[in-house]
Amino acid sequence: MEKEDQEKTGKLTLVLALATFLAAFGSSFQYGYNVAAVNSPSEFMQQFYNDTYYDRNKENIESFTLTLLWSLTVSMFPFGGFIGSLMVGFLVNNLGRKGALLFNNIFSILPAILMGCSKIAKSFEIIIASRLLVGICAGISSNVVPMYLGELAPKNLRGALGVVPQLFITVGILVAQLFGLRSVLASEEGWPILLGLTGVPAGLQLLLLPFFPESPRYLLIQKKNESAAEKALQTLRGWKDVDMEMEEIRKEDEAEKAAGFISVWKLFRMQSLRWQLISTIVLMAGQQLSGVNAIYYYADQIYLSAGVKSNDVQYVTAGTGAVNVFMTMVTVFVVELWGRRNLLLIGFSTCLTACIVLTVALALQNTISWMPYVSIVCVIVYVIGHAVGPSPIPALFITEIFLQSSRPSAYMIGGSVHWLSNFIVGLIFPFIQVGLGPYSFIIFAIICLLTTIYIFMVVPETKGRTFVEINQIFAKKNKVSDVYPEKEEKELNDLPPATREQ
């Protein structure tokens, strides 16, 4: 009977699969799509900025002003992502995980309409403001989707479903690259449609996701609605007997009673969550500061130096995006076999090696004729390495190493680090590139090395373990006797009254 229950636990039901698809396609896909959507049509959009300025002022826009406006267009997205991350805790605690995703569609559908009409309205300000809104959408979804799916999934499918959001981010990037081909929508007339299409997945999610269950953990632990939690589990698992899983959630609820809701400020003060928090910051910072955006930024120049014609670079870039999708799809299937820790070590080590070899290849490309081809290989190897570990695993890891009361605040911190790091790399890499030239990637190699060492020394394997079991592993690292021991309750009570109320 016990064996039968274990087999049941791992079943991917139609309801669970569809809920995963709707959450990831309606939210994570848009993150990836909006990362890449403005790249291909940038020439036509900047011409629109100039034409609009000319119509208003009867003179062409100055080069500096145009560069500033375009920089704002690009940078508003990660800035919005940072704002969205700060909203996560409030939304998921008050609206639930599913409710937060449904609310988040406002920040997709509204800017999609605005961007689609921006050319007719003759307003580049609409585009800049809309980029801020879709950034907020991405900031919320990049945190809430992994949280939602991690709480829906049985523990033996938690890794695979936890990687799905990153898979849909890569699919979104690839679709934007394909739609952004000059023969498709990267044209003077097509770019508003390209930008406006981001609202389609949001509309689908808004229509269909309400018919799928809320997180059972949220319903039981935070809403104290045991019957609703049991019904949600029965719907997700496809059978009536969910007593074992309900008992697991009750144990988690019992373990957390001493803590209550843990705010961001409390999280920074709690000894029992210290190494979980440090690991979150290191992994999220390492994910972005390892140079993934810089690699994509530099890729076009690498392809051109290897002899790829300027008109063909867009196809090679799309090919790189396809490799990213394929490797992330592979990760979905191997994460439960190889484990999270191993994939992180493999991924960061691969990125480290690629950055070192790429530095050598770029330094010697004018001396040795075949070095540009080595550079192309390094870009592809780096993309593969990042797709295997650094891209998909950190968000999944946050879901697994925190319990219900601290998870929203942990995602707020992790998401903020993610988007700030993203913004910093985008802001300073062009200057680093000018100053260091081909040696720019040494900085990213050092970050990959330090992150790899940290993972090897500190990060445990979480595969196949319950949330409480994982926190018991960290309890030893944090030098506390249990997940939430009595002295931790005293620690919380010793905080200043104003802090406890946050």
Curated annotation (Swiss-Prot):
Modes of activity regulation: Fructose uptake is inhibited by mercury ions. Fructose uptake is only slightly inhibited by cytochalasin B.
Binding site for D-fructose: 31, 166, 287, 295-297, 386, 418-419
Keywords, sorted A to Z: Acetylation, Cell membrane, Glycoprotein, Membrane, Sugar transport, Transmembrane, Transmembrane helix, Transport
Modified residues (N-acetylmethionine): 1
Entry GO CC: apical plasma membrane; plasma membrane; sarcolemma
Pfam families: Sugar_tr (PF00083)
Membrane topology: Multi-pass membrane protein
Compartment annotation: Apical cell membrane; Cell membrane; Cell membrane, Sarcolemma
Membrane spanning residue stretches: 18-38, 68-90, 98-118, 126-148, 161-181, 192-212, 277-297, 313-333, 342-362, 371-393, 412-432, 439-459
Gene Ontology process terms (BP): cellular response to fructose stimulus; D-glucose import; D-glucose transmembrane transport; dehydroascorbic acid transport; fructose import across plasma membrane; fructose transmembrane transport; metanephric proximal tubule development; regulation of systemic arterial blood pressure mediated by a chemical signal
NCBIfam families, per database record: SP
Function statement: Functions as a fructose transporter that has only low activity with other monosaccharides. Can mediate the uptake of deoxyglucose, but with low efficiency. Essential for fructose uptake in the small intestine. Plays a role in the regulation of salt uptake and blood pressure in response to dietary fructose. Required for the development of high blood pressure in response to high dietary fructose intake.
Protein name as it appears in the record: Solute carrier family 2, facilitated glucose transporter member 5
The organism of origin for this protein: Rattus norvegicus
Gene transcribed to yield this protein: Slc2a5
